[in-house]
Amino acid sequence: KKAFFVTDKDLIKFGVAAEIIKVFGENQIPYELYSDVKANPTIANVQNGVAAYKASGADFIVALGGGSSIDTAKGIGIVVNNPDFADVKSLEGVADTKHKAVPTFALPTTAGTAAEVTINYVIIDEDARKKMVCVDPNDIPAVAIVDPELMYSMPKRLTAATGMDALTHAIEI
């Protein structure tokens, strides 16, 4: 089996991704790294991820990061197993996908929007200049590993920002 490892460049820079890569190596799990993840993931991030996943020959996804990495992984996993939704814009709202996403293991590094356990994810439509809220019970990660050590490894400023993000989401509802 091969992992498709979705994370962002900051987690690579902070050395957090290296810890997961070390676990892959210790367990002889081949992986493909995908780090084209923006702070607010875009349609292009998902589309590029779908192409990279298909080219990699991976069997499952490991998403390390905050909501952005996990949301990107959710979008990739849904589109790969539901090719009728290759136009990522078609995922906006309540998507009528037929198949569960690629099995995904979510490793959150922030305590923000709980992307690792919800049916929601957000993708930015840069052309329309708007957030697409996507709702799909088929996109929930198969496994969520909430390790406080991952959260402690984040800069305090980022931890505070994700707390404010969670508060903002709660107020918006």
Residue ranges of model-derived segments:
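A glycine/threonine-rich phosphate-anchoring loop and its flanking beta-alpha core
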Residues: 82-173
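Short beta-strand/turn micro-motifs composed of small residues
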Residues: 6-7, 65
